[in-house]
């Protein structure tokens, strides 16, 4: 069935105008953007197949080549889909610029979409103002976190350059288990001592993974 074969009152465009965007399913919203299917393939069915196969969250991370594996999704449509999610990511970043950190949840929300490859462990440092606003973040290491990879001098040199009042460490666990390892605790201890010496406080160390987080401060480990 083609879009034009659907009762006019039930077509996505008409329902959007009549009842608002909330009345449409994710597949219908995507179909509105992609607009047309290919020979023998209804664009709504194509979008339903795409979302049911990958899930909406996973869809945002698919490459152009992976998107094209779904029948009816060529290069142009794959680029449109990738562009949608890239805009969404940039909007999220823009809304979180100068975010005031009140707790670990704020750090978790800020880091969403900012870890380029979640199959690898990344360590970031967030530089904060006197009002606990995030000035900037920087990637410190990529790979398994060990004390030998961490150079406090470089981290705090960057903090001084940014005129940061305090810093927060953030790293991900690709396994999804956010409990800290002994190495995580060792790194935190080293950087806390360096921060105390330089009077640039290490406010927290937040581990993220599998839509969850662990805060050293919340667990009285700082």
Curated annotation (Swiss-Prot):
Domain MPN: residue ranges: 100-222
Is the Zinc keyword given for this protein? yes
Q: Which InterPro entries match?
A: MPN, RadC_JAB, RuvA_2-like, UPF0758, UPF0758_CS, UPF0758_N
Q: Which PROSITE patterns does this entry report, sorted A to Z?
A: MPN, UPF0758
Q: Is Protease among the key words of this record?
A: yes
Q: Where does Zn(2+) bind?
A: 171, 173, 184
State the Gene Ontology BP annotations. proteolysis
What are the recorded GO MF terms, alphabetically?
metal ion binding; metallopeptidase activity
Give the matching SUPFAM superfamilies: JAB1/MPN domain (SSF102712), RuvA domain 2-like (SSF47781)
Q: Motif JAMM motif: where?
A: 171-184
Keywords from UniProt, A to Z, are: Hydrolase, Metal-binding, Metalloprotease, Protease, Zinc
Cite the PANTHER family for this sequence. Answer: DNA REPAIR PROTEIN RADC, UPF0758 PROTEIN YEES-RELATED
Q: Which family does it belong to?
A: Belongs to the UPF0758 family.
Q: What is this protein called?
A: UPF0758 protein CT0611
Source organism of the structure: Chlorobaculum tepidum (strain ATCC 49652 / DSM 12025 / NBRC 103806 / TLS)
